[in-house]
Amino acid sequence: MEEMKKTAIRLPKGKQKPIKTEWNSRCVLFTYFQGDISSVVDEHFSRALSNIKSPQELTPSSQSEGVMLKNDDSMSPNQWRYSSPWTKPQPEVPVTNRAANCNLHVPGPMAVNQFSPSLARRASVRPGELWHFSSLAGTSSLEPGYSHPFPARHLVPEPQPDGKREPLLSLLQQDRCLARPQESAARENGNPGQIAGSTGLLFNLPPGSVHYKKLYVSRGSASTSLPNETLSELETPGKYSLTPPNHWGHPHRYLQHL
């Protein structure tokens, strides 16, 4: 039995013969080992642990050695020799030679004293030499010493008028010039509905024709949203209306035939 157990352990898995074979209607069971499994496991681990070789760099003698600081008689009191079994000793360089090597690439006055008072005074920032930059948080409050390089409003190119609508533009300019004295008179009378500067620009087209509308355009801030337009029909649906806003967000200042 003992010989059979050793043979079962040493033979490769492909050449092992089952000690016991059992089968039924569902499966076939092959038994390759029979005995105390703990003894086999202990033998396996004891054999594996006995083959371990300790490396030379991890021997107890090398581990017991510590770091040593030596100060020979030929060296100055400020110089110490560092020796360790884990690192390779570097060639020793005196402190004075190290300072000379570090200052080789620096000019003479700078090597003596790199932090002189004259350099500190030169590096100080004068009040008149403050940097100017624009604050992105807000445009209304400006701190002293800072200025905005750009105006608050965006620079948007004005739409170019079409040559076919020049008569309509001239008509609107004439109405705008006529609305200015009416605006001043309305302010004196206290009528807010006739003030063009505060509420908008009122276009009075010829009332005799039934194909015209009274257009009221409010002056809002230029934005991507549609402008506030109020169309009040007088008699029948008109033939003229305002064109939609262009791609810059500003409404066209002329009429377009429907």
Swiss-Prot record:
Q: List every stretch annotated Disordered.
A: 55-93
A matching Pfam family: Vg_Tdu
User: Cellular component terms, GO, for this chain's entry?
Assistant: nucleoplasm; nucleus
Q: Which GO terms describe its molecular function?
A: transcription coactivator activity
Entry annotated with the keyword rRNA processing: no
Where's it found, cell-wise? Nucleus
Keyword set for this entry?
A: Nucleus, Transcription, Transcription regulation
For biological process, the GO terms are:
regulation of DNA-templated transcription; regulation of transcription by RNA polymerase II
The record's InterPro entries line, in alphabetical order, gives: TDU_repeat, Vg_fam
Give the compositionally biased regions (Polar residues).
55-65, 74-87
Q: Briefly state the protein's biological role.
A: May act as a specific coactivator for the mammalian TEFs.
How is the subunit organization of this protein annotated in UniProt? Interacts with TEFs.
- Family, similarity comment: Belongs to the vestigial family.
**What is the protein name given in its UniProt record?**
Transcription cofactor vestigial-like protein 1
The protein's organism comes out as Homo sapiens
